[in-house]
Regions:
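A short beta-strand submotif of the Rossmann-like class I SAM-dependent methyltransferase core
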Residues: 70-76
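Short, glycine-/aromatic-enriched active-site segment of Class I SAM-dependent methyltransferases
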Residues: 97-121
Length: 151
């Protein structure tokens, strides 16, 4: 993961947003397998649980196994075929999501060697808002930022 580019700016921005809105007393369910940002959250005092690589499009049981007070999905919803069902199965009342916004000139990203490293959705901001609204979530804070990959 991140062999060629490490997303320092995105991680710093995401951590600042997390620290602004979430206490380190909370337990976070971070959607996806343990990753570099999971480690950053832990290094900053957060208790982090992760899913274990199951196909969340067809099986959301991982969201029921452990108790958590915050659900995070950082740069992962674009990989799911069915983020609607995942959002319906979240078992807490705090949610933090980040997504790469769709650029009008870019095709969906697709790795030819890793089936988990593919984008099914390329969201526009209104589409994420609609998805959250349809699944009963209320947006209370948001930030948009750029993440230049080559810098």
């Amino acid at each position: 993961m991140y062999e060629k580019t490490f997303p320092n700016k995105r991680f710093a921005h995401t951590l600042a947003f997390l620290q602004k809105h979430i206490s380190t007393q909370e337990t976070i369910m971070d959607l996806g397998v343990p990753n570099p940002f999971s480690k950053i959250m832990e290094e900053n005092g957060f208790t982090v649980l992760n899913t274990t690589g199951e196909d969340l499009d067809t099986n959301q049981q991982a969201l029921d196994i452990q108790k958590y007070t915050v659900f995070t999905a950082f740069e992962i919803f674009e990989h799911l075929l069915n983020p609607y069902t995942v959002l319906q199965n979240v078992k807490c009342d705090k949610l933090l999501i980040s997504i790469p916004l769709r650029l009008w000139f870019s095709p969906a990203y697709r790795s030819k060697t890793d089936m988990w490293d593919r984008h099914y959705h390329e969201f526009e901001d209104w589409q994420l808002d609609w998805l959250l609204e349809k699944t009963g979530w209320k947006i209370t804070a948001r930030e948009k930022f750029t993440h230049p990959v080559k810098k």
